[in-house]
Amino acid sequence: MTGGKESSGPGTQLAFPGWGAPSREALRWERPGLRLALWPGWLHTTPLHVADLMEHLRRAIPWRQPEVTVYGRRHPVPRLTCWLGDAGCAYRYSGLVECPHPWTEPLSQVRDRLEAHLGVGFNCLLLNRYRDGRDRMGWHADDEPELVADHPIASLSLGASRTLRFRPRPGGAPAEGDPPEPLSVELADGDLLLMAAPTQRYWQHGLPSRLGVKSERFNLTFRAVQPGMEPQPQL
């Protein structure tokens, strides 16, 4: 893990305004406009079995590879995705409209554990499946109008290790002088990363390809959207 991390001291609770303080020790990054917390191997500290959860993700999730429009041309996204959530929690991003699939029992159990750990609620889940190191995600910020403003996003990693990169958004983070340096965070199997406000307003993140990686990675990003928009289900 790189980028000048700061570790909370023994017994220190990592608290942000507006939501509960997790009890376990975390690594944290705080820069102008950016707040991150990382619990290495968090999933392995729970009663949930990672191998069983990964097999569930492979077999029970209706994965698809959507297309996005870039400069007037359609391109498949370089990964597989699926959107789960409570009724009415649809989501628009990159020109796509995602109608939620219902929660599965194993993923509902993960949500329950996560909410108990963080003291904050989530009503939807974006799943990304990176089949190997060629799959990736470009620079973006999760700032769509459907998302509850300034609500934290929790990202859970399973499988292969990959590097999540952060950079100030065009226009700069709220700081005087030179913009903050980019940041890289290595995410391993079972790691839990929390992106707290105002990170999405001032920073972008992306997952570059890593051609040496031959195995798959699942990323579970728990979010909160404002219910109500209910487009037609995808066929």
Question: For each predicted feature, which ranges?
Answer:
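Non-heme Fe(II) oxygenase metal-center motifs and adjacent flexible, charged/small-residue loops
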Residues: M1-L235
